[in-house]
Amino acid sequence: MAALSAIMFQFAQAQDVFNEMSYSPGQTVFSLNAPVKGVVRIYDSGIAGKLLKTVKMRQDGVDKWTATVKGNLKGKFYTFDIGKGETPGVFAKAVGVNGRRGAIIDMSQTNPDHWTTDLRPVIKSPADLVIYEMHWRDYSVDESSGIVNKGKFLSLTEPKAIQHLKDLGINAVHILPSFDYASVDETRLDSAQYNWGYDPVNFNVPDGGYS
């Protein structure tokens, strides 16, 4: 029981660290683990745009800093700065174009319907797996695919995409990196750009190039 209590305590502490931005309609709380005091900057846009506010953070424990900004900031963007340049933070879950600023969103509204109850098919043995290595863009971008959302995350929500895998006898998919990565400029998605995605910028954010 003591071991379980210790694990639960550590889990709660970890969750506290992971939540660098906690939104509610009345206020947004920013939290940062850093060796020195920093500031939070609020912007009206995910790239360029206007600086709306700079807020000094206050100490809230060892190497922990917080700032509370009153008002409804949904749809705005933020960065942290401890004197070495601006960053959306290590644990950002949503960002603007090219991942340079964190996005202030309501995380309770992000999951699709039935997200928490979705179950994968049962595989009796690893030997039964027929695995296809998939790149989001490669799999769906060809004109002959018949897919509407070519090169996007939404491509795999289309029946044709899944049926093609079934027709090939595939029952498991290994998807190449889906997180926000650096080498594709999201302001130029109509130009020829390509990478597998092993150059992460924001580990906890889906890449904007596929969004």
Per-region residue spans from a language model:
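Catalytic domains of carbohydrate-active enzymes, especially glycoside hydrolases
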Residues: P159-Y181
